[in-house]
Swiss-Prot record:
Gene3D superfamilies per record: IlvD/EDD C-terminal domain-like (3.50.30.80)
Assembly behavior: Homodimer.
This protein's pathway: Amino-acid biosynthesis; L-isoleucine biosynthesis; L-isoleucine from 2-oxobutanoate: step 3/4; Amino-acid biosynthesis; L-valine biosynthesis; L-valine from pyruvate: step 3/4
One GO term (biological process): isoleucine biosynthetic process
Lineage per the UniProt record: Bacteria, Pseudomonadati, Pseudomonadota, Gammaproteobacteria, Alteromonadales
Active site: 520
Catalytic activity: (2R)-2,3-dihydroxy-3-methylbutanoate = 3-methyl-2-oxobutanoate + H2O; (2R,3R)-2,3-dihydroxy-3-methylpentanoate = (S)-3-methyl-2-oxopentanoate + H2O
Source organism: Shewanella oneidensis (strain ATCC 700550 / JCM 31522 / CIP 106686 / LMG 19005 / NCIMB 14063 / MR-1)
Keyword flag Cell cycle: no
UniProt protein name: Dihydroxy-acid dehydratase
């Protein structure tokens, strides 16, 4: 049987000092020998998705201690991408993922914790904790803070649903009055929780369900609903059950690397494509797979993107549905159920919601609203919004009058009635992106699936914003924003402002945008990111010139710079002749701190998940 990791610091005469310190944290004589469960919280008053998490660790701890464990909580940092957006703060967002992963590893290994509960919610926090959990490979359960309620307001006597992106677009649209813009701003983010659409935070929290590492409802149950309390309590109970299975029964199926196996990554990708998740999820799934030592790559994502239909359309791809509507339709388990019936899901994989010996098939039998016989489960998925602004968790217990089980015209569709037979994400490749790039097809208008235009090149997001707002960009342009990749930014900024401003100027369907940076989960339109190799790594995107013809063909999965090989070779020679200034932006003024320079030294391009280049760290 595996020995408790915590025994290293709690057993033997030579650990008297460590035990004395444990006692000072509240550990009693009869507690020694119990498993120590780390609770990685991410409470902060900076982030609406985390502002309500302060007491969540205590909830989880109470369940752990009742089940016979010792619970010890610590905190990680959490960056709000929306607040950091549009200025130098965004350089820190993606690098914070690595810091979060490292900080969880540091705390868990320094104190020899036996298992882990991750309380996450927003964009880089869930991926960072996921990377750490798979790196550590000790029993783990994820439980997030939950989504925000959708905003609602009246404009021209019409009630509309809103989210963060609506506020940004309205503010940049000169046709929207100051009064209406302010009204939208005040209504867009009414409660605590992760932003209400299928943006990065909610996408990742949904994916933890598909990976098998969080409980049903984790990705969709509203932060404000009282039913979410039970998810935190059950996370504590479940992690103790997993801990006992591993340490007392030598059941390695309780470990995260055996749960989040290759098949589980395929399941998560199928879900991602079916629900039109944020393109950032590709980055984070690739990074998590490397930590899990699973050989899951962009090629696998490309392969699956050609097989999986688009079954669930949510804001920002449509104003009709938000996460509260996804939950009413059955949440992640509802989408997985449709994927299973379409023959696109592995159900023989372990899941933290399954009892010992169980698997995803048994979880779906209970939690898929289209097949369950459990009325409590149906009531669970009828939990709805209250429409009352608040920063408090569990502050309401409203319910929808009925489930949305309309698989023909509802929020979640069956394969037969899919929003499209093409999935919500696609991998494109060609001479402009030899190692691939990503487009969220769920947000692309059908008229733009094939697009040919002239390059309008910018060396930074700031210059692109100035060009768009200043009228340089016109219909038919392909806006190219380069040197914003993991190494070149550094930090791979999100390009939500450029895409929002294109929309506000009426160019959302008339232009394309290509970048080696990334996009907010709130982005829609013909926005192609993660171009690899990035400009700073010698990618072709660095060689594009104004006026070059760029050809995009999403159905054919291709992206081409219509310049001859000989011309490109000549441009590459010219670039290399710049010596130390080769593959660096011309004329860009940007302060890059030592912390960001350290990140850039080890960063890989997006096709590798923008993780550290391990070859530079090997002995």
């Amino acid at each position: 049987m595996p020995k408790l990791r915590s025994a290293t610091s709690t057993e033997g005469r030579n650990m008297a000092g460590a035990r004395a310190l444990w006692r000072a944290t509240g550990v009693k004589d009869n507690d020694f020998g119990k498993p120590i469960i780390a609770i990685a919280n991410s409470f902060t008053q900076f982030v609406p998705g985390h502002v309500h998490l302060k007491d969540m660790g205590s909830l989880v701890a109470s369940a752990i201690e009742e089940a016979g464990g010792i619970a010890k909580e610590f905190n990680t940092i959490a960056v709000d991408d929306g607040i950091a957006m549009g200025h130098g703060g965004m350089l820190y967002s993606l690098p914070s993922r690595e810091l979060i992963a490292d900080s969880v590893e540091y705390m868990v290994n320094a104190h020899c914790a036996d298992a882990l509960v991750c309380i996450s919610n927003c964009d880089k926090i869930t991926p960072g904790m996921l990377m750490a959990a798979l790196r550590l490979n000790i029993p783990v359960v994820f439980v997030s803070g939950g989504p925000m309620e959708a905003g609602k307001t009246k404009l021209s006597d019409k009630l509309i649903k809103l989210d963060l992106v609506d506020a940004m677009v309205a503010a940049a649209d000169s046709s929207v009055s100051d009064e209406d813009s302010a009204k939208i701003e005040r209504s867009a983010c009414p409660t605590c929780g992760s932003c209400s659409g299928m943006f990065t935070a909610n996408s990742m929290n949904c994916l933890t369900e598909a990976l098998g590492l969080s409980l049903p409802g984790n990705g969709s149950m509203l932060a404000t609903h009282s039913d979410r309390r039970e998810l935190f309590l059950e996370a504590g109970r479940r992690v103790m059950a997993l801990t006992k299975r591993y340490y007392e029964q030598d059941d390695t199926s309780a470990l995260p690397r055996n749960i989040a196996c290759f098949k589980a990554f395929e399941n998560a990708t199928a879900l991602d494509i079916a629900m039109g998740g944020s393109s950032n999820t590709v980055l984070h799934l690739l990074a998590a797979a490397q930590e899990a030592e699973v050989a899951f790559t962009m090629d696998d994502i490309d392969r699956m993107s050609r097989l999986v239909p688009h079954l669930c359309k949510v804001a920002p791809s449509t104003p009709k549905y938000h996460m509260e509507d996804v939950h009413r339709a059955g949440g992640v388990m509802g989408i997985l159920g449709e994927l299973d019936r379409a023959g696109l899901l592995h159900t023989d994989v372990p899941h933290v919601a399954a009892d010992a010996g169980g698997n995803l098939k048994s979880v779906l039998a209970k939690y898929d609203v289209m097949q369950t016989q459990d009325d409590n489960v149906k009531q669970f998925f009828m939990a709805g919004p209250a429409g009352i602004p608040t920063t408090k968790a569990f502050s309401q217990d409203c319910r929808w009058p009925s489930l949305d089980d309309d698989r023909r015209e509802g929020c979640i569709r069956s394969r037969e009635f899919a929003f499209s037979q093409e999935g919500g994400l696609a991998v494109l490749s060609g001479n402009l992106a030899e190692n691939g790039c990503i487009v969220k097809t769920a947000g692309v208008d059908e008229s733009n699936l094939i697009f040919v235009g002239s390059a309008r090149v910018y060396e930074s997001q700031d210059d692109a914003v100035a060009g768009i707002l200043g009228g340089e960009v016109v219909a038919g342009d392909v806006v190219v924003i380069r040197y914003e990749g993991p190494k070149g930014g550094p930090g791979m900024q999100e390009m939500l402002y450029p895409t929002s401003y294109l929309k506000s100027r009426g160019l959302g369907k008339a232009c394309a945008l290509i970048t080696d940076g990334r996009f907010s989960g709130g982005t829609s339109g013909l926005s192609i990111g993660h171009v690899s190799p990035e400009a700073a790594a010698g990618g072709t995107i660095a060689l594009i010139e104004n006026g070059d013809r760029i050809e995009i063909d999403i159905p054919a999965r291709s992206i081409k710079l219509a310049v001859s090989d000989a011309e490109l070779a000549g441009r590459r020679e010219t670039m290399l002749a710049r010596g130390p200034m080769a593959w660096k932006p011309v004329g860009r003024e940007r302060f890059v701190s030592m912390a960001l320079k350290a990140y850039a030294m080890l960063a890989t391009s997006a096709d590798k998940g923008a993780v550290r280049d391990r070859s530079k760290l090997e002995d």
